């Protein structure tokens, strides 16, 4: 399925806006391009590209994800990448950008991804830490917190932060695969 899908994804959804690589959205019924938005949930894709071996695209898209993060010191739920305006200003403490940072570090050994992860973590703590845990943000521009912390923060976001800074042999990705909830599962051979 991946082999059949990735070429059309790269052909029809990849969008070079300025110097950045982004992936837009399409109507699943017609295939027509619909939006020039990219967001927190899309930030898993650099990691998936890295897992598939396409490190050049993975690096470029991760650079775009990090640019999205740095616009306001934390990523919005959705950004219009053509205008660089926030389309949905919430931040739900999502793991996807950290996940991609981990995979890129794992596959390249490039210290820039640990530095990127350090910035992500420091901003995460600075804007989301509370006396009782971590709080989602209602607005990444104002940094207004909301009384919400989804379970994936502990199950995924912190796990990927840990893995990014742990010894590289903490998980052997030749023997382990992380599922969509970041649970390690033994790979069949």
Label each PLM-derived region with a short phrase.
Residues 1-189:
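Glycan-recognition and catalytic cores of secretory/periplasmic carbohydrate-active enzymes
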């Amino acid at each position: 399925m991946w082999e059949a899908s990735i070429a059309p994804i790269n052909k029809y959804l990849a969008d070079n806006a300025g110097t950045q690589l982004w992936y837009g959205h399409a109507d699943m019924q017609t295939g027509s391009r619909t939006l020039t938005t990219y967001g927190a949930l899309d930030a898993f894709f650099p990691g998936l590209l890295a897992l598939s071996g396409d490190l050049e695209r993975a690096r470029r898209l991760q650079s775009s994800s990090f640019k999205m993060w740095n616009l306001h010191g934390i990523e919005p739920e959705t950004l219009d990448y053509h205008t660089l305006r926030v389309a949905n200003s919430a931040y739900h403490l999502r793991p996807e950008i950290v996940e991609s940072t981990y995979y890129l570090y794992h596959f390249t050994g490039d210290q820039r991804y640990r530095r990127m992860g350090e910035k992500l973590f420091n901003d995460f703590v600075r804007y989301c830490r509370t006396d009782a845990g971590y709080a989602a943000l209602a607005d990444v521009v104002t940094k207004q917190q909301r009384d919400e912390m989804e379970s994936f923060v502990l199950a995924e976001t912190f796990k990927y932060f840990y893995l990014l800074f742990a010894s590289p042999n903490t998980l052997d990705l030749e023997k382990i695969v992380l599922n969509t909830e970041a649970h390690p599962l033994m790979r069949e051979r």
